[in-house]
Design a protein with these regions (language model features):
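Conserved class I S-adenosyl-L-methionine
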Residues: 1-40, 43-51
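A conserved beta-strand element that flanks and buttresses the S-adenosyl-L-methionine
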Residues: 109
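A short glycine-rich, Lys/Arg-flanked "PGG" loop and its adjoining helix->strand segment in the class I
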Residues: 123-135
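C-terminal alpha-helical "lid/dimerization" subdomain adjacent to the S-adenosyl-L-methionine
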Residues: 144-191
Length: 213
């Protein structure tokens, strides 16, 4: 079983978009889209873990510019081939933890990345993303809630409390994927010394975290 999450998303690039087609999630996805478009309107945005560009495409409709990054060339290839009418998205391959852009941005977005960060690495994660944006800048993170009977079951947990799912791709390969599902109180506690004006919206399938630094 493959435990390398980079390999998992490389192999999943061609089928990744299917997660956005689930009928029961459309209302929440539209709500998230509206929040992101409003938050990033006329702003410069750094997007981390942009994947196949689902959110890049939507945010670009209102943002001034997006510097979209991912560690995986396979998903970036899919993202680059989408339509961006304002020609305001720049895609580059970067590892978040070694990413040092020449200029800081006004804001930052990360979709479904929190859940793939190990609990013992969260402090470093927030120090890093906070350092990518200008003072008083805005960060928005979204991720999945665990919905009993709907979400892929958690099949493993390590000594730090990180949880893992066993996922099977269409090619039959099995992958043990890090997927944490934090509660709001945990998130607020983790950010209390690193953020201000914390807003947390908890939906059924997703949560939305917004804060300033």
């Amino acid at each position: 079983m493959n435990t390398d999450i980079v390999t998992y998303y490389k192999d999943r690039a061609g089928e990744y978009k299917e997660i956005y087609f689930k009928p029961e999630r459309q209302e929440e996805l539209k709500r998230i889209e509206d929040i992101l478009k409003d938050t990033f309107k006329k702003k410069t945005v750094i997007e981390i873990a942009c994947g196949t560009g689902y959110w890049s495409e939507r945010i670009s409709e209102t943002a001034k510019s997006i510097f979209a990054t991912d560690i995986n060339d396979s998903v970036l290839e899919v993202a680059r081939n989408k339509g961006y009418s304002k020609n305001n998205v720049n895609f580059q391959n970067h590892d978040l933890f070694s990413f040092n852009p020449e200029e800081r941005s006004e804001s930052l977005f990360g979709g479904f990345i929190w859940s793939h960060i190990k609990l013992q690495e969260l402090d470093n994660f927030f120090d890093k993303v906070n350092n990518l944006i200008l003072p008083n800048g805005t960060i928005v993170l979204i991720d999945n809630n665990y919905v009993e009977g709907i979400s892929t079951p958690v099949t493993d947990e390590d000594e730090f409390g990180n949880t893992y799912q066993t996922r099977t791709l269409k090619d039959g390969s099995n992958h043990l994927v890090l997927k944490n599902f934090p509660r709001e109180d945990f998130i607020r506690e983790k950010l209390k010394s690193k953020a201000k004006e914390i807003s947390f919206i908890n939906l059924k399938y997703y949560w939305i975290l917004k804060y300033n630094i």
